[in-house]
A protein has these predicted regions:
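Membrane-spanning alpha-helical segments of multipass transporters and channels
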Residues: 1-182
Length: 182
């Protein structure tokens, strides 16, 4: 989320310059957006990589799957940068951009599968997880970590525990493969 909020003020502050240079045919909008994205990318991806690396090893997740984990985190940060730049470009000023920025994140968070089991959504809302980028991030991270894992359950009722990672994925209603989720 910090990757998105960091770029929300970008375009409103530079609109006058951008419009002047576009009018002078110095470059087109796509070139400016691509250049801005490339400049903002390392600045906003690095904190996610550092934080993710610390958390991954501290929590003790599967060391063999760390590379996939980092790739998923970087894609999430890049998605947030793009979303932030899009909101920034659409907003007439920085204040509006700061107020509109959290809205797509909140919708994505609510329908991302972490707080609500996506299998329990009413029929009218079943389409919302598909537009939630956080659903794809969460699903990818869960699939990455739980595929091929087995657990031992020491409870009196063994059905209370998931015996395999695939059972965890089934309970979360994640039916895609890692490649499909990414």
């Amino acid at each position: 989320f910090s990757a998105m909020s960091a770029v929300l003020n970008v375009f409103p502050k530079e609109k006058v310059i951008i419009n002047r240079e576009r009018a002078a045919n110095a470059y087109d909008t796509l070139s400016y957006f691509a250049a801005k994205f490339l400049v903002e990318m390392p600045i906003n991806v690095l904190p996610s990589v550092v934080f993710g690396t610390i958390v991954y090893w501290t929590v003790g997740l599967n060391p063999e799957r760390f590379g996939y984990f980092l790739c998923i985190l970087m894609l999430e940060a890049l998605t947030c940068v793009c979303l932030g730049l899009a909101v920034s470009a659409l907003a007439p000023n920085a204040e509006v951009a700061q107020n509109l920025g959290p809205l797509p994140l909140i919708v994505s968070l609510i329908f991302g599968g972490f707080f609500i089991n996506l299998g329990s959504l009413p029929a009218a809302a079943e389409w919302l997880p598909y537009i939630s980028f956080l659903k794809w991030v969460f699903e990818s991270l869960v699939i990455n970590e739980f595929t091929g894992v087995t657990f031992t359950c020491e409870l009196a009722d063994p059905t209370a525990c998931a015996a395999t990672g695939e059972e965890v994925l089934k309970r979360l209603t994640f039916t895609n493969t890692l490649g499909e989720s990414v």
